[in-house]
């Protein structure tokens, strides 16, 4: 019989009953009701568990179990069935963090975007226009070509006023804008931005595929985020390849340099702790006492931005003690085979003093060989003459199968012994000029250098080796003259005593750690590691900092060794199933010519930040150079676009479709004819690049899609410039361009445009900053509501996303949204009877193609100045022709096109057939049966089908493809390599398999390490062990980069460059109110969010101050009467932030931290400086583009999407901080 439930009143009367005690009153009998336990049981009950992950660019890519009850996600928990790492190694689990554990809050939060929304002003204009114009394109034209109408909805951005709309209506509006733009201005005025595909590959590929099919450019992100380390392409010819976090455990000595591992790599931090338990020594280099400092045996509190000085001094010690005072055999042999130390460099002589020039090549020494301008020479000790070693860039492309690191002369086939130095065979000890940079003015150092004289081609030629130049550069005392440091106490650049003045670190500590780092490499055979990160990568001169740091791992032979080398972790960059993803994301299966634009250049011009440059580029140039080519940064970008170094979309001041018609009318019958026509029009200045007049309305970007990103409030460096010039809405910019530097190559328009974009379309599941400024917001599915894939460099697995619940309300997955949009575009093209078109497309000179041999010797020849002929694909961009039929966009979007079978697949210069895999996908995915252009193709209409296709077509997830890939590389190198993948040749990952349990990827030449036999992944191990060259000019790791522009800026070798000198205001500034202080403004990663994600979630907001904060040193705050938790204004001419002050002794004096991506929709009051709310963390920022990062068409310095290009750095700036006099929430 069921017990009758008593009322709460009677239950309370139990407290008056006597209590029965036992065991000397150590226990008692109670009669309380235990029904409350059911609440707990119900809370943790569930109907099903689904494996998924988080797509948030945290680099974690952790596997999570999602628990569902009655169709509601109730909680998530860490998955525990990762494959074992093997004996004597810690396992990967547990992986996760409190941020990820709180994600399910978003699904049902007030921030959830549940329906499509359109700005009210815009939707009313659209509805009225449709009543007047039957043709939707004419309806859209009547809005955007009417200045008053366009201004009315653009000025409403960021000010609310959204109304709910129906999917068909919204899709038609977007489609009309897209097709109108295609016909009026050109397809390249429709732009897409979505970052970090590895964090959710299918979602990224959905929009990228759509943009590629309609001819719109995709913007890069890795460089724009300043996550890209440009030094990696410069040194290795590789974007970024780093060890998985488990490889830290193999290390014997670890330096964390600008990387706060416990905070930013939370799921992986246990490996660092475990390595230390095992006996590894850990050094922390950080200005503040960061979380990573608590792991350390030694903490070097460095002055921010001076890391390059410390690294140069450490390099000085290692070179002095382990190369000169006593030659370390392992280091010497490593340097000869795997670095460019023995390669010969030419010298020019003027007034008895020498200057380093370019490499000596086969052409210079009279060797008759293919690509003789791309084969640098060494001095062979065995023959006492020149030799051309195998493995150079020229041998990569000459078809002779000699692209390997065997120490053999490629012409004679004889073994060689490269000489590291010409000292001992020199003809002279001369004086070489070395550029030196400081805030007190750049100057020239004179150093002693051994020099050999040779008569080549009838001319006296002076040569030395890279090794000799490096020793001179570091000021190492070789006993050959008096122009070097006498001891470590000598304040000459770059000694330990010199760096102490720069960094504040005692010279004794520098000597000690440099010795330990090198000695550990000797004792452990190279297991010395440096973990680097955003702390040193977000500066203007991050590449010179990194080169100085990375020289250390090269000097001790640590690179290419498990437990050694560099470990750069900024951004979830490693997309492991690369070839399959690339095929689908760029629509190579159909079109084959994607437009891949570097993001930094795009935003620099689109937001008009180029108009506000105030520091002449000549201040940054080498004191050895006669002068800088230009005074304005933007001029170098124009040069880069003109010479084919960088992409530039929009490309021309003319619609690419109309340009093709003109070329055809002029008699062009082939793509080559079209290229010649375009080149002639450019030379005659009848046609111009759009970048030469970016403020002309015909050159504006018109439609911008943003998905999987919070561009406006997270990554939009120069936030207020975005609001003013790109969006045309209320902004907090306190800068003007009246006294800025004027460019030479760009037309200056006195009135800067405001509101360039016609539409900003955002796909998101939460109403974040970008959504609040968008014209249209489309409701996206969360990570627990769709099929997708994720991978990272931190572990070797590919993780799935899976729908624990169906996408609620009217939300859709990104794949389904772009699929629906492609249908709408095709339907509208049918409705207006849009004919197929042909478009002229310009693409840059690409890395890993023959185009990286386009411009020999690193010499700049500008056809626009008459220095050479304009030749497409050689001295200017490639010119191609692409046909598009907008009626077929939907059919192509949802089918895997025939090019997969007809054309080779590949990556990094390799290629192979995947026709068999294409046929197997027809069987597994089904074929398209509709009577369309896609009939008979594999069906990828669903996201899961697209994921299966990616896994099947990629060498890291399909063993047969991996073997084909290695065979392709064997054909180039004449090495035996496919054994790296043969043991797993029969494996082919499926979505169901990786859902059941994570699988370690297959070893592939798409990357440079090996997972064979359960090995922990470490980069460049296949280069070292298998003798595969690096993809650089010499085929080796580069200490010396000899491009003319690198010489202009004094960066042929690693050096120290101080941070830019920035003043918060120039001629005009707001009135001073009370006490103020000027501080260096840094925006490191946040403890309570991952970028802007989780910042606005209730669980994370409750853990700290519940809104935006700025961290200050307590003494700096005391000087300005600021107390902890006071409201402050943090501002300069770029914008203003209003936040609470967090005072801490862990922050050094002279700097302020504002953790990045604190969105402005949570607890942000107003400021009288702008009479508006405070801005985002990026309001005080403005980007600075660096010319040396624009180089292209030259070996490893050639363009690749997210591979090389100027970074969106933002740290070289200062702000004024003062107490906010009155907190005004602007609610009246």
UniProtKB/Swiss-Prot annotation:
GO terms for molecular function: 4 iron, 4 sulfur cluster binding; metal ion binding; molybdopterin cofactor binding; nitrate reductase (quinone) activity. Its EC number is 1.7.5.1. Belongs to the prokaryotic molybdopterin-containing oxidoreductase family. Residues 47-111 form the 4Fe-4S Mo/W bis-MGD-type domain. It is a peripheral membrane protein. The alpha chain is the actual site of nitrate reduction. The gene is narG. This is Nitrate reductase alpha chain. InterPro entries: Asp_de-COase-like_dom_sf, MopB_CT_Nitrate-R-NarG-like, MoPterin_dinucl-bd_dom, Mopterin_OxRdtase, Mopterin_OxRdtase_4Fe-4S_dom, Mopterin_OxRdtase_prok_CS, MopterinOxRdtase_cofactor_BS, NarG. It holds the Pfam family Molybdopterin. It catalyses: nitrate + a quinol = a quinone + nitrite + H2O. Gene3D superfamilies: 3.40.50.12440, nitrate reductase tail (4.10.1200.10). SMART domains: Molybdop_Fe4S4. One of its GO terms (biological process) is nitrate assimilation. Keywords: 4Fe-4S, Cell membrane, Electron transport, Iron, Iron-sulfur, Membrane, Metal-binding, Molybdenum, Nitrate assimilation, Oxidoreductase, Transport. It is an enzyme of class 1 (oxidoreductase). Mo-bis(molybdopterin guanine dinucleotide) binds at residue 227. Binds 1 [4Fe-4S] cluster per subunit. Binds 1 molybdenum-bis(molybdopterin guanine dinucleotide) (Mo-bis-MGD) cofactor per subunit. [4Fe-4S] cluster binds at residues 54, 58, 62, 97. It is found in: Cell membrane. PANTHER family: RESPIRATORY NITRATE REDUCTASE (PTHR43105), RESPIRATORY NITRATE REDUCTASE 2 ALPHA CHAIN (PTHR43105:SF2). Its cofactor is [4Fe-4S] cluster; Mo-bis(molybdopterin guanine dinucleotide).
């Amino acid at each position: 019989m069921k017990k009758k439930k008593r009322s709460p009143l009677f239950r309370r009367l139990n407290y008056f009953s006597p209590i029965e005690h036992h065991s000397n009153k150590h226990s008692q009998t109670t009669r309380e009701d235990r029904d409350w336990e059911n609440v707990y049981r119900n809370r943790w009950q569930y109907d099903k568990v689904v494996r998924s992950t988080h797509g948030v660019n945290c680099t974690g890519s952790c596997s999570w179990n999602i628990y569902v009850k009655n169709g509601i996600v109730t909680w998530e928990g860490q998955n525990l069935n990762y494959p074992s790492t093997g004996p004597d190694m810690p396992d990967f689990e547990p992986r996760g963090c409190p941020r990820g554990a709180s994600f399910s809050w978003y699904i049902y939060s007030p921030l959830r975007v549940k329906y499509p929304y359109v700005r009210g002003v815009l939707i009313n204009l659209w509805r009225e226009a449709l009543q007047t114009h039957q043709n939707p394109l004419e309806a859209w034209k009547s809005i955007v070509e009417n200045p008053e109408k366009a201004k009315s909805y653009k000025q409403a951005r960021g000010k609310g006023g959204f109304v709910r709309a129906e999917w068909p209506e919204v899709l038609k509006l977007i489609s009309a804008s897209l097709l109108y733009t295609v016909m009026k201005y050109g397809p390249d005025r429709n732009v897409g931005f979505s970052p970090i595909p590895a964090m959710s590959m299918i979602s990224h590929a959905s929009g990228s595929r759509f943009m590629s099919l309609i001819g719109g450019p995709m913007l890069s992100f890795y460089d724009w985020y300043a996550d890209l380390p440009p030094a990696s392409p410069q040194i290795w010819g590789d974007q970024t390849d780093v060890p998985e976090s488990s490889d830290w455990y193999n290390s014997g000595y670890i330096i964390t340099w600008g990387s706060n591992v416990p905070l930013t790599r939370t799921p992986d931090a246990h490996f660092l702790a475990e390595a230390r338990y095992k006996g590894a020594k850990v050094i922390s280099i950080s200005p503040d006492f960061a979380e990573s400092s608590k792991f350390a045996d030694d903490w070097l509190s460095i002055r921010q931005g001076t890391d390059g000085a410390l690294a140069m001094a450490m390099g000085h010690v290692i070179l002095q003690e382990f190369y000169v005072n006593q030659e370390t055999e392992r280091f010497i042999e490593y340097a000869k085979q795997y670095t460019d130390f023995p390669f010969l460099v030419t010298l020019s002589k003027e007034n008895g003093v020498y200057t380093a020039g370019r490499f000596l090549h086969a052409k210079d020494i009279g060797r008759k060989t293919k690509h003789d301008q791309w084969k640098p020479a060494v001095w062979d000790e065995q023959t006492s003459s020149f030799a051309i070693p195998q493995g150079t860039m020229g041998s990569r492309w000459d078809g002779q199968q000699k692209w390997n690191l065997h120490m053999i002369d490629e012409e004679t086939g004889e073994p060689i012994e490269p000489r590291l130095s010409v000292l001992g065979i020199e003809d002279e000890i001369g004086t070489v000029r070395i550029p030196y940079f400081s805030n007190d003015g750049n100057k020239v150092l004179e150093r002693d250098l051994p020099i050999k004289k040779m008569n080549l081609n009838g001319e006296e030629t002076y040569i030395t080796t890279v090794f000799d130049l490096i020793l001179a550069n570091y000021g190492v005392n070789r006993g050959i003259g008096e122009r070097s440091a006498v001891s470590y106490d000598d304040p000459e650049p770059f000694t330990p005593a010199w760096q102490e003045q720069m960094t504040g670190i005692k010279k004794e500590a520098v000597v000690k750690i440099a010795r330990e780092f090198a000695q550990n490499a000797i004792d452990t055979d190279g297991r010395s590691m440096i973990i680097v990160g955003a702390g040193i990568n977000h500066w203007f001169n991050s590449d010179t900092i990194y080169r100085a740091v990375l020289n250390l791992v090269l000097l001790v032979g640590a690179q290419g060794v498990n437990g050694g080398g560099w470990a750069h972790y900024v951004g979830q960059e490693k997309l492991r199933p690369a070839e399959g993803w690339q095929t689908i994301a760029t629509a190579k299966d159909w079109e084959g010519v994607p437009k891949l634009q570097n993001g930094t250049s795009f935003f620099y011009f689109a937001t008009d930040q180029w108009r506000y440059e105030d520091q002449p580029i000549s201040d940054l140039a080498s004191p050895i150079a006669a002068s800088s080519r230009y005074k304005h940064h933007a001029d170098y970008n124009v040069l880069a676009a003109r010479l084919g170094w960088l992409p530039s979309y929009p490309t021309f001041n003319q619609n690419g479709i109309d340009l093709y018609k003109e070329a055809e009318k002029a008699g062009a019958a082939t793509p080559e004819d079209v290229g010649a026509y375009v080149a002639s029009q450019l030379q005659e200045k009848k046609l111009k690049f759009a970048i030469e007049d970016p403020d002309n309305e015909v050159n504006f970007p018109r439609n911008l899609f943003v998905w999987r990103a919070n561009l406006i409030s997270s990554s939009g460096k120069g936030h207020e410039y975005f609001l003013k010039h790109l969006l045309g809405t209320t902004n907090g910019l306190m800068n003007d361009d009246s006294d800025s530097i004027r460019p030479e190559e760009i037309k200056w328009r006195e009135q800067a445009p405001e509101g360039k974009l016609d539409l900003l379309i955002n796909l998101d599941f939460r109403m974040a900053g970008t959504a609040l400024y968008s014209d249209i917001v489309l409701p996206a599915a969360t990570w627990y509501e769709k099929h997708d894939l994720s991978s990272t460099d931190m572990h070797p697995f590919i993780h799935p996303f899976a729908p624990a619940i169906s996408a609620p309300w009217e939300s859709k997955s990104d794949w389904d949204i772009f699929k629906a949009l492609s249908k709408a575009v095709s339907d509208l093209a049918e409705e207006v009877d849009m004919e197929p078109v042909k478009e002229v497309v310009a693409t840059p000179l690409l890395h890993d193609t023959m185009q990286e041999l386009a411009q020999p010797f690193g010499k700049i020849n500008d056809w626009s100045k008459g220095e050479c002929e304009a030749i497409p694909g050689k001295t200017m961009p490639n010119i191609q022709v692409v046909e598009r039929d907008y009626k077929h966009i939907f059919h192509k979007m949802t089918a895997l096109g025939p090019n997969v079978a007809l054309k080779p697949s590949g990556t990094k210069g390799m290629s192979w057939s995947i026709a068999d895999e294409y046929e197997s996908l027809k069987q597994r995915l089904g074929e398209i049966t509709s009577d369309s252009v896609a009939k008979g193709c594999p069906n990828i209409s669903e996201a899961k089908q697209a994921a299966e296709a990616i896994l099947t077509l990629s060498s890291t997830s399909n063993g047969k493809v991996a073997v084909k890939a290695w065979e392709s590389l064997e054909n180039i190198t004449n090495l035996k390599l496919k054994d790296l993948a043969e043991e797993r040749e029969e494996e082919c990952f499926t979505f169901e398999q990786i859902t059941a349990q994570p699988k370690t990827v297959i070893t592939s030449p798409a990357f440079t390490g090996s997972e064979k036999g359960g090995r922990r992944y470490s980069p460049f191990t296949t280069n070292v062990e298998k003798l595969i060259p690096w993809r650089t000019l010499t085929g080796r790791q580069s200490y010396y980069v000899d491009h003319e522009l690198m010489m202009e800026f004094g960066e042929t070798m690693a050096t120290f460059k101080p941070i830019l000198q920035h003043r918060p205001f120039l001629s005009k500034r707001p009135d001073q109110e009370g006490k103020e202080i000027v501080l260096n403004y840094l925006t490191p990663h946040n403890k309570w969010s991952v970028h802007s994600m989780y910042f606005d979630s209730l669980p994370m907001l409750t853990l700290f101050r519940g809104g935006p904060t700025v961290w200050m040193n307590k003494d700096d705050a005391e000087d300005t009467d600021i107390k902890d938790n006071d409201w402050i204004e943090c501002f300069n001419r770029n914008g203003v932030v209003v936040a609470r002050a967090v005072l801490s002794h862990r922050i050094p004096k002279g700097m302020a931290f504002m953790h990045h991506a604190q969105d402005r929709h949570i607890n942000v009051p107003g400021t009288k400086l702008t009479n508006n709310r405070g801005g985002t963390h990026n309001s005080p920022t403005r980007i600075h583009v660096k010319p040396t990062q624009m180089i292209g068409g030259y070996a490893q310095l050639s363009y690749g999407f997210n591979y090389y290009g100027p970074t969106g750095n933002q740290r070289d700036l200062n702000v004024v901080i003062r107490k906010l006099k009155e907190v005004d929430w602007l609610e009246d």
